[in-house]
């Protein structure tokens, strides 16, 4: 697990903090770059710390390569490249990568499209075979049927990410007003659905031929490779692909606003008003981009930020806000976003933003403020390259958009070189007294909250209708097969499976019943540790749910010796992150820090734990913000579905509640409730410590001795709540969200605890049903029907029984059919799977272990499970034995025992006017109508 191929001059990189004269960073990732005759740029990075390889291909084509009337093509091809190519069958791309034990995905933005895989090293040739086939041999499979199927998937993605959520249309409204109609940033990445519907196959194919050639891409192969052998494989699979047109890179196209534009939208999902202000700035390569990056944090990040001081603290207009610089390839914007309280007038917010700007001008900031931001940037930078895929992304991005992988160091140095005058200069140039685009989002019927001078911006709302048949057009073109110099239909054989090397886990027992678990991981100068205190919501008073949650928010607001601002600055100065949060069964502290700052960061954690401030002013603010957050989530269909499903399964058990509580329960809580909880329940004997990173066992054990010594062991009483019995008969439930563009589906029942002997076997059994992209439910509902952006099933468990859940968000007018498809697939899953499917399941599970412990987060997650559930250090091997020993017969026995659709809860959250009636077709009687809190509507 020792990663010695990442060449970093730590001393040079880290000296900048607190120095007046910034040294030039000597940061470097070792790589070899070359180009094929067809123009494909290839970058190889060797890293033998784990037996895995990542492949990332950055195509220089995003929505900015499109034209008005022909938008959404780049995003469409992101989807279509996963479907089929000339030598790889329908839906086989995902299956073949998963069968090799790998993971994969892709993404599109305004400037580019990236595809990636991470696989055990023996499957590299398979990845290159697949990637080359869709780069050079895709067009013969781009049919009208495939095109229309992915149109449906894209529309469902838009419904899920934009149409069916609060404030979803914000970006669309902003860019339509920021950029002229001919500007490549005038449309969203997902595009106009009308453009895709009106596009012909000729249009789509022409776009592909123009932009997806090898000469418009950078491919990075990083990991446990032999460079010479890899070069030969690259030449074999990619060398004969014909280049596309030599299109020039886009030039910067900054915009200027001749006036401030203010627009508004009535949002049926919003419960609180939101204001955004966007100022036009510069492209990502511009010299001013680095200073704008830090300006965004200075204005809005933290309690010292002027936007926070004026809007949150002084005027109490909003519980939260943020500001940031968003530079892209050809233009950029500087954004301020404020989500107010339900009655906040957005005109007051706009005025407060300008008042905060004036405060920034008069109060200014110091070099120390900049140094704290640079420390945070440094830690974030290290985290971004903590995996071979992370390094692959960075190398590909900087090569494609900045001309060289070495630009990663240049851009890093730009941030380190920013000084006070740079930040003041960009503020004066781009923000002060400049025109901007402002969006107002207000709850439906609350036009009194919009800022003066705002005009309605029309949004095309999809009409909700009852079930309709999908109309499939005809018009497939006959395209000749594309020749190759060898038989590409033959999948290469993977080499020997790499041996699983489990990390060496250690444990030390202190006095008082507290233990520390750890593992060394010295690939980067980082340390990650956590403290878990058993209890969480389980120890809340049932009438005051939310106490534990408020504790973890309030304890981060200063200590007895530090004000909230002083604590925040102390953490930032170290470049560390300290997060405290509550779950249903525990309170947790999560810490990430540079190795050299581990001890002072741990000292701050001790101070937070044992010297709380109990600031009454901060308590009132957090309580108010929590209530507002609960109200906001009550309008989000996905949140409603999860919360109601939980209540239906857990009944009167305390686990039926959300850890944040309800509006009523939080309103009843006072600060003494928090103090009493901590004094009674924060106990050493209920706590465990987990630590991974560049630290030895002895250093870790010694470092925590002081913390353990200060911690008292107590007797803590847990209420013995009776776990409800699972359903014996299926029931259908419906929550009405009028005009919802999608229906949220949750189907399932109360199942097993994490410690049940069958739990892990069930997760394996579930794989083919819906445990990954190639699962049956996703293949039918997404790939075959085009009803959803994704469908899944899974078992969730802890020390208490969890749920088996089947879930999806489907197009509203497919609700009835989708729920019945779920039911049918689960019913027929009891027919034995064949040996091929079982082998696929085993491969997905076993082979993926090669990439399981690459990062600090993954490793500490494993250690946390060991500590929480008292698992053997090598429990992974026990799990592997379960997989290897599974037969078709034993798999089927698990299905019959644990997948029982006639005993499940069927919940839909959607538009009752058009979809409620269809739920009767399930055969479980009339659906029971519930409100958003899970109460029966009478």
Which positions does each model-derived feature cover?
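Positively charged n-region of N-terminal signal peptides that target proteins for export
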Residues: 1-5
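Non-catalytic, conformational "gating/processing" segments within enzyme and secreted inhibitor domains
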Residues: 144, 151, 205-237, 435, ...
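Proteolytic maturation boundary segments
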Residues: 18-42, 226-267, 409-532, 690, ...
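Bacterial N-terminal signal peptides
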Residues: 8-16
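Short, conserved secondary-structure transition motifs
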Residues: 154-161, 253-266, 374-384, 593-594, ...
């Amino acid at each position: 697990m020792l990663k010695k191929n990442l060449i970093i001059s730590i001393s040079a990189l880290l000296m900048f903090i607190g120095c007046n004269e910034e040294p030039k960073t000597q940061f470097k990732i070792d790589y070899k770059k070359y180009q094929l005759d067809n123009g494909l740029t290839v970058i190889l990075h060797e890293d033998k710390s784990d037996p895995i390889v990542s492949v990332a291909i950055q195509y220089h084509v995003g929505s900015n390569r499109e034209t008005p009337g022909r938008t959404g093509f780049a995003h469409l091809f992101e989807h279509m490249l996963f479907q089929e190519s000339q030598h790889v069958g329908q839906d086989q791309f995902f299956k073949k990568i998963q069968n090799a034990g790998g993971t994969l995905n892709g993404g599109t933005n305004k400037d580019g499209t990236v595809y990636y895989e991470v696989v055990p090293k023996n499957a590299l040739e398979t990845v290159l075979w697949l990637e080359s086939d869709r780069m050079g041999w895709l067009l013969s499979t781009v049919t009208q049927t495939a095109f229309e199927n992915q149109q449906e998937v894209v529309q469902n993605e838009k419904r899920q990410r934009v149409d069916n959520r609060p404030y979803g249309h914000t970006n669309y409204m902003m860019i339509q007003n920021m950029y002229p109609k001919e500007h490549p940033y005038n449309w969203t990445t997902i595009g106009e659905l009308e453009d895709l519907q009106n596009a012909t196959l000729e249009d789509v194919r022409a776009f592909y031929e123009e932009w997806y050639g090898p000469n418009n891409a950078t491919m990075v192969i990083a990991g446990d490779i032999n460079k010479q052998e890899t070069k030969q494989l690259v030449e074999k699979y990619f060398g004969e692909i014909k280049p596309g047109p030599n299109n020039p890179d886009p030039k910067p196209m900054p915009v200027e606003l001749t006036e401030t534009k203010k627009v508004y939208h009535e949002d049926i999902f919003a419960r609180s008003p939101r204001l955004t202000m966007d100022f036009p700035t510069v492209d990502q390569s511009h010299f001013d981009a680095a200073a704008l990056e830090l300006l965004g944090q200075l204005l809005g990040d933290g309690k010292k930020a002027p936007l926070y001081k004026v809007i949150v603290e002084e005027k109490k207009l909003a519980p939260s806000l943020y500001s940031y610089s968003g530079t892209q390839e050809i233009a950029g914007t500087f954004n301020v976003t404020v989500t107010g309280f339900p009655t906040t007038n957005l005109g007051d917010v706009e005025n407060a933003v300008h008042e905060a700007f004036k405060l920034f001008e008069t109060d200014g900031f110091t070099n120390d403020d900049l140094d704290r931001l640079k420390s945070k940037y440094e830690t974030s930078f290290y985290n971004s390259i903590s995996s071979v895929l992370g390094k692959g992304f960075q190398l590909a991005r900087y090569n494609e958009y900045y001309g060289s992988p070495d630009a990663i160091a240049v851009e890093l140095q730009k941030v380190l070189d920013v000084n006070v005058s740079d930040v003041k200069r960009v503020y004066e140039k781009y923000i002060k007294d400049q025109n901007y685009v402002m969006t107002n989002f207000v709850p439906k019927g609350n036009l009194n909250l919009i800022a003066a001078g705002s005009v309605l911006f029309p949004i095309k709302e999809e009409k909700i209708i009852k079930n309709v048949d999908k109309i499939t057009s005809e018009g497939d073109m006959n395209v000749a097969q594309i020749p190759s110099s060898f038989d590409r239909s033959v999948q290469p054989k993977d080499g020997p499976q790499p041996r699983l090397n489990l990390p060496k886990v250690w444990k030390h027992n202190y006095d008082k019943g507290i233990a520390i678990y750890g593992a060394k991981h010295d690939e980067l100068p980082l340390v990650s540790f956590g403290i878990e205190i058993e209890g969480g919501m389980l120890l809340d008073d049932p009438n005051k749910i939310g106490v534990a949650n408020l504790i973890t928010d309030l304890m981060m607001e200063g200590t007895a010796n530090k004000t909230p601002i002083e604590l925040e600055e102390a953490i930032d100065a170290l470049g560390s992150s300290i997060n405290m949060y509550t779950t249903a069964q525990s309170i947790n502290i999560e810490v990430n820090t540079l190795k050299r700052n581990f001890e002072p960061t741990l000292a701050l954690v001790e101070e937070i734990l044992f010297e709380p401030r109990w600031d009454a002013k901060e308590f009132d603010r957090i309580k108010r913000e929590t209530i507002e957050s609960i109200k906001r989530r009550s309008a989000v269909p996905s949140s409603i579905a999860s919360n109601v499903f939980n209540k239906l399964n857990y009944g009167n058990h305390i686990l039926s509640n959300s850890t944040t509580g309800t509006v009523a329960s939080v309103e009843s809580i006072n600060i003494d409730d928090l103090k009493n909880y901590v004094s009674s329940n924060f106990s050493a004997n209920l706590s465990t410590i987990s630590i991974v990173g560049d630290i030895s066992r002895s250093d870790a054990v010694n470092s925590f001795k002081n913390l353990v010594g200060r911690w008292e062991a107590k007797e803590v009483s847990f209420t013995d709540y009776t776990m409800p019995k699972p359903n014996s008969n299926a029931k259908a439930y419906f929550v009405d969200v009028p005009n919802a563009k999608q229906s949220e589906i949750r189907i399932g029942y109360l199942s097993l605890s994490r410690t049940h002997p069958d739990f892990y076997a069930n997760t394996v059994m579930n794989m083919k049903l819906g445990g990954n992209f190639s699962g049956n439910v996703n293949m039918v509902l997404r790939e075959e029907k085009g009803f959803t952006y994704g469908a899944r099933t899974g078992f969730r468990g802890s020390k208490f029984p969890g749920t088996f859940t089947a879930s999806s968000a489907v197009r509203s007018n497919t609700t009835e059919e989708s729920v019945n498809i779920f039911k049918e697939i689960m019913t027929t899953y009891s027919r034995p799977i064949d040996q091929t499917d079982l082998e696929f399941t085993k491969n997905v599970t076993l082979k993926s272990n090669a990439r399981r412990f690459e990062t600090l987060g993954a490793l500490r997650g494993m250690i946390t499970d060991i500590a929480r559930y008292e698992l053997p250090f090598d429990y992974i091997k026990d799990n592997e034995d379960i997989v290897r020993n599974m037969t078709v017969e034993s798999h089927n026995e698990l299905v019959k025992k644990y997948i029982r659709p006639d005993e499940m809860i069927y919940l839909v959250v959607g538009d009752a006017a058009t979809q409620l009636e269809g739920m009767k077709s399930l055969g479980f009687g009339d659906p029971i109508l519930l409100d958003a809190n899970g109460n029966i509507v009478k």
